[in-house]
């Protein structure tokens, strides 16, 4: 990672481990980030733009917060995405340091202005930009700084190099200790495609997404309906399956864009495209999980990274409910913080999980297993019924010994 005046604060152990030093990025995109004056330190990047440069017909999908106090940029982006039916959105504009949430009509006007100015500078048709904000709730944006910064960023600081992507990922950060950026290439038949993703998190992380912004872009050709279906499926199995502090924010937004710049046959959610659709969905789920794990690793005050695996549940919904019940248990969290393999607290959380039927959790057919990440034998196994033919197994995979970051 190159060092600059705005990335110096990311020189931490986690930044060294998790920030990529290089990457291969999808074709047909220009990204970047600058300091425009939202953050008050005078140097931290706080304005980012991601632009599709390949054509004006990119497919876009989005998943947004379930909080009833949706921030102004969330409301504006939801309106535009619905109005466009996921087609013809060509850019994202994001500010950090101010959430533009609970800001009334002034906040709505500011969000709309960010869209209008970005569209004008990038020569987009009207309402071709989604807008996102993250930061402090309840304060009006320094909108003049942002509207001045958008042309400066658009005309002078966009590109597709690794540093441009690092700048973009850095500019959306708030309390994060490192920028979160992942890239991968994959093959669908004879076609090679690239995915790039960036996100921010740190505090208020809980299903269904919180203080979370995330962006997936690819050069694969994907229809809007297929992209929306894949994104929702992937988010449910990644960003909606993590928790740090159990709070849900007002600004959560995960968006995806596919511009088709790498060519190939259109991927749709029809029977004729079923194989390619399934393969792409698998790639994006894996990709989303990588990004979501970075959010957990950077959770405010987090000292552990734990994966919960529920096996042999009656349904995916039940498995997720059981895992969420354990993960959000304060008693379980304190036990893990204290390095105490207190399996009783785990069973307690399983017992009050919101499952579908009385048969979803059968006490005398339930086991708990603690699994070291190095693949060695479980450090403790609790069998409540050793001779049962089929057990519901709860596995906890601990990735790091206790470490204060």
Curated annotation (Swiss-Prot):
The keyword Acyltransferase applies. One of its GO terms (biological process) is L-arginine biosynthetic process. The record marks 210-211 as: Cleavage. Pfam families: ArgJ. The alpha and beta chains are autoproteolytically processed from a single precursor protein within the mitochondrion. The record marks 134-135 as: Involved in the stabilization of negative charge on the oxyanion by the formation of the oxyanion hole. Pathway: Amino-acid biosynthesis; L-arginine biosynthesis; L-ornithine and N-acetyl-L-glutamate from L-glutamate and N(2)-acetyl-L-ornithine (cyclic): step 1/1; Amino-acid biosynthesis; L-arginine biosynthesis; N(2)-acetyl-L-ornithine from L-glutamate: step 1/4. The active site is at 211 (nucleophile). NCBIfam families: ArgJ (TIGR00120), PRK05388.1 (NF003802). Heterodimer of an alpha and a beta chain. This is Arginine biosynthesis bifunctional protein ArgJ, mitochondrial.
């Amino acid at each position: 990672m190159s060092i600059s005046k705005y990335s110096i604060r990311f020189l931490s152990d986690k930044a060294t481990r998790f920030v990529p030093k290089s990457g291969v990025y999808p074709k047909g995109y220009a990204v970047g980030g600058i300091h425009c004056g939202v953050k008050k330190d005078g140097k931290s990047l706080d304005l980012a733009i991601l632009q599709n440069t390949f054509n004006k017909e990119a497919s876009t999908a989005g998943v947004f917060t379930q909080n009833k106090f949706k921030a102004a940029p969330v409301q504006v982006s939801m309106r535009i995405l619905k109005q466009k039916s996921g087609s013809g959105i060509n850019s994202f504009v994001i500010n950090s340091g101010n959430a533009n949430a609970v800001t009334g009509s002034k906040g709505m006007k500011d969000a709309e202005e960010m869209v209008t100015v970005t569209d004008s500078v990038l020569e987009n048709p009207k309402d071709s930009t989604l807008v996102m904000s993250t930061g402090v709730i309840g304060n009006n944006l320094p909108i003049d700084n942002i509207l001045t910064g958008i042309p400066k960023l658009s005309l002078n600081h966009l590109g597709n190099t690794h540093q441009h992507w690092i700048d973009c990922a850095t500019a959306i950060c708030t309390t994060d200790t490192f920028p979160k950026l992942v890239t991968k290439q994959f093959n669908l038949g004879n076609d090679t495609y690239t995915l790039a993703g960036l996100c921010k998190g740190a505090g208020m992380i809980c299903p269904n997404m919180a203080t979370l912004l995330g962006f997936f872009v690819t050069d694969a050709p994907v229809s809007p309906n297929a992209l929306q279906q894949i994104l929702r499926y992937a988010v449910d199995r990644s960003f909606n399956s993590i928790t740090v502090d159990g709070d849900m924010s007002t600004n959560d937004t995960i968006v995806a864009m596919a511009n088709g710049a790498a060519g190939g046959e259109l991927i749709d959610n029809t029977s004729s495209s079923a194989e390619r659709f399934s393969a792409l969905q698998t790639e994006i789920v894996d990709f989303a999980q990588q990004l979501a794990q970075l959010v957990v690793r950077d959770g405010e005050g987090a000292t552990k990274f734990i994966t919960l695996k529920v096996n042999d549940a009656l349904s995916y919904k039940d498995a997720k409910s059981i895992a969420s019940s354990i993960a959000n248990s304060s008693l379980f969290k304190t036990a893990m913080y204290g390095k105490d393999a207190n399996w009783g607290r785990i069973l307690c959380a399983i017992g009050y999980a919101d499952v579908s039927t009385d048969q979803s959790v059968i006490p005398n057919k339930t086991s708990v297993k603690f699994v070291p990440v190095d693949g060695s034998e479980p450090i403790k196994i609790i069998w409540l019924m050793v001779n049962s033919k089929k057990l519901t197994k709860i596995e906890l995979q601990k990735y790091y010994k206790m470490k204060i970051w």
